């Protein structure tokens, strides 16, 4: 048993002062430090009045397999970026070997994240995710818009899914990812989602990320028309959005991006068991615009970094700073609190893990950070945490300590 007495606790919904947290694998009690010491006389006690305790972050959408990318891929617009991914994929993927993946996962923990949703296209990151201290939902992704190759792509997906399923435990879950409505044939998507239904698996899908996707699915025109003709000799989309969305009706699904979703699609998704995953830096770097949070207010959303194929960092503090600034119509102090909640409790809810809150009975997935210097108004803590934090002092996952390097 351990007891931590910080300056304040961000639960994250409220700020608690003059209290301490007693925890082992789970949070056992929140009370005055004196009462906790009486209750747990053998506990190790840490007083740190220059720190804040808040839940660990959940990063529900990232692609580990492209973690070797720094300046190889082209940013600025979605289609040139996609061409660059295809052009450099075979060079980039082998560069992130086991050591690279291990270092990437370690850096994720060191920056305050305690749970992730890892989208895996090839399964090369499976062992690293299994071995990590992180809580991981491992999304086995299916892709393929050509009906002739659907059986081959499904077989690959099924093999990867069952391989990951063998390793399930309280920290690791196997899940299903459908790449997108423009890149996965209806039949292939349905077969993969039938597996998700059979096993009660969480699902992730990129949906309405770019203007190009919107134009292609609505009209069969735009920049994707040239792309699909050139690479796959396809002249029309393989899905209409209404039929595609119906496939997810009975599933818990994370709809990633949603920048270009229309009102009808938003209403449909709002009627499902769904979360939206907002990736502001990725959306900015690929020229996709900004998610309208007012339009999607009927659907819970969480914050994620996406992968290093479309971001410079997997640090959620960087993502929160970006989110704060790309939504200028939101009042800064109240929006900062909302963002902290979206990065903790909402992310945990999206992934289905226990945690994301400093509350009795929750898993002790927490981070201890420096108190911003010169704080005069406690209610401004959320904003100053985002502005002035890059890394925590310590991170705890189910009570296990990870100290800043």
UniProtKB/Swiss-Prot annotation:
Note the superkingdom of the native organism. Answer: Bacteria
Give the Pfam families listed for this entry. Answer: Amidohydro_1 (PF01979)
- What pathway annotation does it carry? Quinol/quinone metabolism; menaquinone biosynthesis
What does altering residue 145 to A do?
A: 3-fold reduction in catalytic efficiency with AFL as substrate
* Signal peptide span: none
Q: Does the keyword Metal-binding apply?
A: yes
Record flagged with keyword Metal-binding: yes
Top enzyme class? hydrolase
Please provide, alphabetically and separated by semicolons, the GO molecular function terms listed in this UniProt record.
hydrolase activity, acting on carbon-nitrogen (but not peptide) bonds; metal ion binding
GO terms in the biological process aspect are: menaquinone biosynthetic process
Q: What is its EC number?
A: 3.5.4.40
Q: How is the cofactor bound?
A: Binds 1 divalent metal cation per subunit.
Q: Where does substrate bind?
A: 141, 145, 179
Q: Its catalytic activity?
A: 6-amino-6-deoxyfutalosine + H2O + H(+) = futalosine + NH4(+)
The entry's family comment says: Belongs to the metallo-dependent hydrolases superfamily.
Query: Which protein, by its recorded name, is this?
Result: Aminodeoxyfutalosine deaminase
């Amino acid at each position: 048993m351990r007891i931590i007495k910080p300056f304040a606790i961000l639960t994250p919904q409220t700020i608690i002062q003059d209290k301490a947290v007693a925890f082992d694998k789970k949070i056992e009690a929140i009370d005055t430090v004196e009462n906790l010491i009486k209750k747990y006389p053998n506990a190790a006690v840490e007083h740190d009045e220059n720190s804040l305790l808040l839940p660990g972050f959940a990063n529900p959408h990232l692609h580990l397999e492209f973690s070797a990318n720094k300046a190889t891929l082209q940013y600025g617009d979605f289609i040139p970026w996609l061409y660059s991914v295809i052009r450099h994929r075979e060079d980039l993927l082998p560069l992130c070997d086991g050591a690279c993946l291990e270092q990437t996962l370690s850096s994720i923990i060191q920056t305050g994240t305690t749970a992730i949703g890892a989208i895996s296209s090839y399964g090369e990151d499976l062992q690293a995710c299994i071995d990590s201290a992180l809580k991981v939902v491992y999304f086995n992704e299916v892709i393929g818009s050509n009906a002739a190759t659907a059986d081959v792509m499904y077989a690959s997906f099924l093999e990867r899914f069952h391989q990951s399923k063998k390793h399930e435990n309280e920290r690791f879950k196997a899940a299903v990812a459908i790449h997108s409505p423009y890149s996965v044939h209806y039949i292939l998507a349905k077969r993969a989602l039938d597996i998700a239904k059979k096993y009660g698996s969480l699902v992730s899908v990129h949906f309405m990320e770019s203007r190009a996707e919107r134009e292609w699915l609505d009209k069969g025109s735009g920049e994707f028309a040239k792309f699909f003709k050139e690479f796959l000799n396809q002249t029309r989309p393989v899905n209409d959005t209404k039929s595609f969305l119906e496939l997810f009706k009975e599933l818990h699904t994370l709809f990633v991006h949603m920048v270009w979703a229309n009102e009808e699609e938003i209403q449909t998704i709002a009627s499902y068991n769904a979360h939206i995953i907002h990736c502001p830096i990725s959306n900015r770097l690929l020229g996709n615009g900004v998610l309208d949070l007012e339009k999607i207010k009927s659907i819970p959303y969480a914050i994620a970094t996406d992968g290093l194929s479309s971001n410079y960092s997997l640090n959620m503090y960087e993502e929160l700073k970006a989110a704060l600034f790309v939504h200028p119509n939101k009042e800064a102090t109240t929006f900062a609190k909302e963002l902290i909640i979206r990065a903790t409790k909402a992310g945990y809810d999206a992934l289905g893990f226990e945690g994301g809150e400093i509350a009795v009975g929750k898993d002790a997935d927490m981070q201890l950070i420096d108190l911003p210097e010169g704080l005069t108004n406690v209610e401004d803590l959320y904003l100053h945490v985002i502005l002035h934090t890059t890394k925590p002092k310590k991170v705890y996952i189910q009570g296990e300590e990870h100290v800043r390097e």
